[in-house]
């Protein structure tokens, strides 16, 4: 029995949930999200709650039960409050700027990196912090990981892009040979 899966998901007043078989459409103040769930999971709307149940007791159905409930909960949270991932850049001459749907990064390469933000994702730059906002948790995390991959932090000086919650384990440099 899934501890996570059996918890019902409360639907706030501003959120509208439509269920059509395995396709669930969630609409709220921050946008609209659609997701197709696994066929072994049954999703039902009861009053101001959404309940997720397995179709049968197979291993696949039980494993998808908790996943479906978590994804659905993230959809409701995303359309009400949204999600944010913050990246911090550290290095001499490193800069970032947002113009429309493009994120321009100067990360010590011979050329600036132009990253086109996907639909539904916004970026804000404050000094040396890039904030990525969106209603889809998976997409926000994916975009943050892609941006971080342009210049991952190195362990000697800590230069590069890192999540603000991430700690980089620093290494000691080489010590000169003694004569």
Placement of each model-derived feature along the sequence:
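N-terminal intrinsically disordered, cationic/polar leader segments
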Residues: 2-65, 69-145, 149-179
């Amino acid at each position: 029995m899934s501890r996570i899966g059996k918890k019902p998901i409360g639907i706030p007043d501003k959120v509208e949930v439509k269920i059509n078989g395995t396709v669930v459409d969630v609409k709220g103040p921050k946008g609209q999200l659609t997701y197709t769930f696994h066929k072994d999971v049954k999703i039902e709307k009861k009053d101001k709650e959404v309940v997720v149940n397995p179709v049968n007791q197979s291993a696949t159905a039980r494993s998808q039960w908790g996943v479906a409930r978590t994804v659905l909960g993230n959809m409701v949270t995303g359309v009400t409050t949204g999600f944010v991932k913050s990246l911090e850049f550290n290095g001499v001459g490193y800069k970032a700027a947002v113009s429309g749907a493009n994120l321009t990064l100067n990360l010590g390469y011979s050329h600036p990196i132009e990253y086109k933000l996907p639909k539904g994702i916004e970026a804000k730059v404050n000094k040396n912090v890039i904030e990525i906002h969106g209603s889809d948790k998976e997409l926000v995390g994916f975009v943050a990981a892609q941006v971080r991959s342009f210049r991952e932090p190195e362990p000697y000086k800590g230069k590069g892009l890192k999540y603000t919650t991430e700690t980089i384990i620093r290494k000691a440099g080489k010590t000169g040979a003694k004569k």
